[in-house]
Amino acid sequence: MERVTRMVVRDRNHPSVVMWSMGNESGWGPNHAAAAAWTKEFDPTRIIHYEGAQGNPQRRGYVPLRSVGKWKTAEEDPVKGEYADLANPDDRDAVEVVSRMYPTVDELERLACDTLVRRPVLMCEYAHAMGNSVGGLGDYWRVIRRHDKLLGGHIWDWIDQGLRKADGRGGWFWAYGGDFGSRENHDANF
């Protein structure tokens, strides 16, 4: 609660704040619900989103977690035939936006067309900008422009992942992972 209340009180007058988020990839529990309720009461002018609020157990079609942070897969739930976090038709009532991370273009279109989803849909992360990426934006935006329910999304993360390091010849470069001697500290294509 304290982090959220401090953030909201501190940032409530910033014109670039268009909505509040209850966190990032930290599960869901009573503290999230309480923080969302407090935030909405303190600032009713902005909407609330949180990707951790995926799936409302009171809604038809809800697919429960099989363990912390792990959703049932298509093999475990052949009725859904897809990852359950994207298949859950709606999110908890504490949030006003259905948030999804990295949906495919087809998954985004399914959410837009799903009659059980009555709230706006936001890709809270998509088109990860690490390395040689950020492709397919045209496909996403064709779908977004077709459906009023879709808000768009936030490209993650529009920043260089490296740290400035001297190159030994008087210059510098953006170093990452194995550039610091360890071969275990890297991300996939780095």
Question: What residue spans do the PLM features occupy?
Answer:
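Substrate-binding/catalytic cleft of secreted carbohydrate-active enzymes
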Residues: 1-189
